[in-house]
From Swiss-Prot:
Record Gene3D superfamilies: Mur ligase, C-terminal domain, Mur-like, catalytic domain, NAD(P)-binding Rossmann-like Domain
Protein name (Swiss-Prot/TrEMBL): UDP-N-acetylmuramate--L-alanine ligase
Record flagged with keyword Ligase: yes
Organism per entry: Legionella pneumophila subsp. pneumophila (strain Philadelphia 1 / ATCC 33152 / DSM 7513)
Major localisation: cytoplasm
Length: 469
């Protein structure tokens, strides 16, 4: 394939207008943007205004606030977010009018169908790894299209339509919708207990679903998997596709050695399979988990023929992803100034990785941790792990659980979580958005770092705290 040639995707039959229900979602907006750039008429609806909605409008996409049956007028197909139920008035109207209604992942699979798809899966690290792969391929002149579940800071967008056939996507296991995808290459970063309601509480079912995802690769495709993850090691012998591994272990095909962390700067050497030479990598993204994410991207880039200088340069230039250990700046409080870091982590393992990275970057500073639990089901099923990891913070401020559309579960509250952490002689303060600034004025000492963490509204709360409060 000549990567300098414009790749033209075949049109989807008679489809001209596509309507997205829940267009502001992280997994939806990028697909809508790519289709808009391909020349389709795109409309969408969402429950409220947001920066994402404003960006889509700036591109010329019609976005309605609120869900009403008249919003789907003219649509040839309706794309449904997994967060939207089947009783939504737009979904009901589309079915009555016999307009096809498809899940988000089915449209993503359609975009990928005629391309060289590279799908990044895993319970943790998907967004960062997808961003890294996209960045390295772009730096190497491959001009990929990409759809990411977060905003790539270098371009301020979740998605981009490139000229080549390469298409990098984040593959979502939360509703098992990654099984719609049939990529040419796939990465699995790890397999951990999350979204277990999708898998009927059966971890073996989760594990085998990841294996099934890898077997959607063609027999000549490539699986790239992390050798540091225990569950991946369990399924490794059963993967019946060409496979490469990455990690710190000596037997990994792509191995990191001599890793050091100096402030935000990670430096390590990557040992690659012959005939590829070792590379010295400098990378402004802290933590062991991000070294692993970088290794996955190096493996994909190397296997696709990206030159060594572009790999090294691409990692040096990488500006990160929105809400992934994102430094918002320094803010003055009544008793001193503190750095504010915004992070999307919402699973105990993600929180642990973030705290570990924090301790490496700022070993002498105090961690003031503002955490918003996300979903009642997750808080309930991982209660013990949340207690263990949140007890590691120096000061913990807990917000109410962000429901994300779930019904409250009796006894599953932030207060109950706080009480168990307090039983370990840890101070925990329950805060709301309204009381947060006053509480921080009371707690913050000069030189502290505030970690605002969670997958709900806390991201916007962090921005508001930085700007206005």
């Amino acid at each position: 394939m000549n990567n300098s040639e414009q790749f033209l995707s075949p049109r989807m039959g008679r489809v001209e207008q596509i309507h997205f229900v829940g267009i502001g979602g992280a997994g939806m907006c990028g697909i809508a943007e790519v289709l808009h750039n391909q020349g389709y008429r795109i409309t969408g609806s969402d429950l409220g205004e947001s920066g994402t909605v404003q960006r889509l409008r700036s591109l010329g996409i019609q976005v309605y606030i609120g869900h009403r049956l008249e919003n789907i007028k003219g649509a040839d197909v309706v794309v449904r977010s997994s967060a939207v139920d089947f009783n939504n008035p737009e979904i009901v109207a589309a079915r009555e009018l016999m307009i096809p209604v498809i899940p988000r992942a089915a449209m993503l699979a359609e975009l990928m169908r005629f391309r060289h798809g590279i799908a990044i899966a895993g319970t943790h690290g998907k967004t960062t790894t997808t961003s890294l792969v996209s960045s390295l391929l772009a730096e190497g002149g491959l001009d990929p299209s990409f759809v990411i579940g977060g905003k790539l800071n270098s371009c301020g967008a979740n998605a981009q339509l490139g000229k080549s056939a390469y298409f990098v996507v984040e593959a979502d296991e939360s509703d098992a919708s990654f099984l719609f995808l049939k990529p040419m290459m796939a990465v699995v970063t790890n397999i951990d207990a999350d979204h277990m309601d999708t898998y009927e509480g059966d971890f073996e079912k989760l594990r085998t679903t990841f294996l099934e995802f890898l077997h959607h690769l063609p027999f000549y495709g490539l699986a790239v998997v992390c050798l540091e993850d225990e569950e991946i090691c369990r399924i490794l012998p059963a993967i019946q596709r060409p496979t490469l591994t990455y990690g710190f272990k000596e037997e990994a095909h792509y191995r990191a050695i001599n890793w050091t962390q100096k402030g935000m700067l990670s430096e390590f050497v990557v040992v690659r399979p012959a005939p590829h030479k070792q590379l010295t990598i400098q990378f402004q993204y802290p933590g062991r988990h991000n070294v692993l994410n970088a290794l996955a991207s190096i493996a994909i880039a190397t296997e696709l023929g990206v030159d060594d200088d572009s790999i090294v340069r691409g990692l040096q230039k990488f500006q990160g992803v929105g809400r992934r250990f994102q430094m918002l700046g320094e803010k003055q409080f009544e008793k001193g100034a503190a750095i504010i870091v915004d992070d999307y982590g919402h699973h105990p393992q993600e929180i642990l990785s973030t705290i570990d990275a924090f301790r490496r970057v700022w070993p002498e500073r105090r961690l003031v941790h503002v955490f918003q639990p996300h979903r009642y089901t997750r808080t309930q099923s991982l209660h013990r792990q949340f207690v263990d990891v949140l007890s590691l913070s120096d000061e913990l401020l807990l917000m109410d659980i962000y429901a994300a559309g779930e019904t409250a579960i009796p006894g599953v509250t932030s207060e109950n979580l706080a009480n168990e952490i307090r039983s370990r002689d840890k101070r925990v303060t329950i805060v709301s958005e309204q009381s947060l600034k006053a509480t921080l004025d009371e707690f913050i000492k000069d030189g502290d770092v505030i970690l605002m963490q969670g997958a709900g509204s806390i991201g916007q709360i962090a921005v508001n705290l930085m700007k206005n409060m």
